[in-house]
Amino acid sequence: MVTFMVFGASGNLANKKTFPALFHLFKRNLVDRSSFYVLGYARSKIPIGEFRESIRESVKPDTESKQVFQDFIDRVSYFSGQYDQSSSYVEFRKHLESVEKKADSSKALRIFYIALPPSVYVTVSSHIYENLYLPGKSRLVIEKPFGKNYQSAVKLKEEVHKHWKEEEIYRIDHYTAKDMVNNFFTLRFANSSSIDAVLNRHSIQSVEIHMYETGGCEGRIGYYDANGVVRDVVQNHLTQIFCIAAMNEPKSASASDVRAEKVNLLKATRPASLKESMLGQYTTSEDGKIPGYLDLEGVPKDSKATTFAASTLHVDNDRWKGVPFVFVSGKRMKKGEVYIKYYFRLKDSGIFSDVKRRRYLILHVQPEEFVNLTCTINKPMTTDLQPIDAYASLNYNEQFKDLMKEKRDGYEILFEDAIRGDPTKFIRYDEVEYAWKIWDEILDSPKKPIPYPAGSDGPEGLEAYMKRHLGHE
């Protein structure tokens, strides 16, 4: 029996991501339908009918799924309570126990998912432990961000660890469950004698880790103005991509070995510096149709919140010493895409050393999922040597068309893993701390960010920055 409890059940994240993901687990029979229950908890007083209807609107079940959805929604309940009052949790426990009586509660597994601001993590997790915890049968699932900087992350860990064991805590970063990010782990280490063999300082000149979004900060002003782009996506999403892109091969695919290698990489990475970073903030678009960040309602007119960041990291280990990793991320960019790009070194001697066009391997995460390798071939239908560019490409949507029809959301995958007790894709406490250590210096720069028009390619000087730090034209 699994009871999946959602704290923050009336919030935007729960509505958009959590409940649709739980429904799809149910629909795909990835949980035992006869003993799976979802309990929502929030402060809002919402009638159960209204709560269930909001989930229906979010899931939008098609005709074929209507009966399955009805079976699912019949197993969803809602409880209104305070987050900081023990009496609310005592009453909720009665509700929980009444639900668990419907199945074999001796085999009950309780998943406590906190979809709330980090400021209440300690309070809520403490009350959960004191009132709802079942020894050996409880898992705490926490959303990012895990703190605001290194110091606060350490303090948060210490407070949560007063009650919860590390092996009971599942810290979510949904980027770890994206198909291409997962596939890249396999692509590297299942092909260690070919692909992974050239991913090192001897063959690679530089690496770009890129996340551009076309959307702005509307609806997230309170969060964004206090945090900025580095806290929002660089310290977590892009750093997780970096780990998969640069880690050494683990001893095994076990959670402990995979996470240990990620930590080894982070420990070997020098902290980001303002000197090697470029921070920006979007302004009104050139056509005047998109408002600038400072024009948004609720934004202080002197705000220095960053909506763009480029920063270069260096890894002091044998594999990557001397290879710059350039992270670049921005809101309201001209084109939205996420990718990892390895730039190969040019030949410095021998045949074709006069060919100076840069070759690269790109792993494209979104919006499309594909792998591209550029290489040099001889121009077809010629008798002499005429080297030209060619591309070897693997497009996931084309090659795995049937499988991709049932594309799974990252949250669905992570919730399934949490229920199964597989922590591999979740973030261990030392990963969190080392990641904050890397980015601490550039989190709250006193400098005014460089302006760039919404819908553009970024701040003035970015092209020169990229050429300088990637080490090529």
Curated annotation (Swiss-Prot):
Catalytic positions are: 237 (proton acceptor)
EC number from the UniProt entry: 1.1.1.49
Q: Where is the signal peptide?
A: none
One BP annotation, GO: glucose metabolic process
SUPFAM superfamilies to which the protein is assigned, alphabetical: Glyceraldehyde-3-phosphate dehydrogenase-like, C-terminal domain (SSF55347), NAD(P)-binding Rossmann-fold domains (SSF51735)
- For this chain, the annotated S-S bridges are none
Does the keyword section mention Oxidoreductase? yes
Where along the chain is D-glucose 6-phosphate bound? 144, 174-178, 213, 232, 331, 366
Gene Ontology molecular function: glucose-6-phosphate dehydrogenase activity; NADP binding
Pull one GO CC term from this UniProt entry. cytosol
Name the positions where NADP(+) 1 binds: 43, 121, 144
Q: Which reaction does it catalyse?
A: D-glucose 6-phosphate + NADP(+) = 6-phospho-D-glucono-1,5-lactone + NADPH + H(+)
Q: Among its keywords, does the record have Transmembrane helix?
A: no
* Cited Pfam families: G6PD_C, G6PD_N
* Listed pathway(s): Carbohydrate degradation; pentose phosphate pathway; D-ribulose 5-phosphate from D-glucose 6-phosphate (oxidative stage): step 1/3
Q: What UniProt keywords are attached to this protein's entry?
A: Carbohydrate metabolism, Cytoplasm, Glucose metabolism, NADP, Oxidoreductase
Q: Where in the cell is it found?
A: Cytoplasm
Q: Which residues bind NADP(+) 2?
A: 341
Q: Which family does it belong to?
A: Belongs to the glucose-6-phosphate dehydrogenase family.
Please name the HAMAP family in this protein's record.
G6PD
Query: PANTHER family under this entry?
Result: GLUCOSE-6-PHOSPHATE 1-DEHYDROGENASE C7.13C-RELATED, GLUCOSE-6-PHOSPHATE 1-DEHYDROGENASE G6PD
Q: What biological function has been recorded for the protein in this entry?
A: Catalyzes the rate-limiting step of the oxidative pentose-phosphate pathway, which represents a route for the dissimilation of carbohydrates besides glycolysis. The main function of this enzyme is to provide reducing power (NADPH) and pentose phosphates for fatty acid and nucleic acid synthesis.
Name by which UniProt lists this protein: Probable glucose-6-phosphate 1-dehydrogenase C7.13c
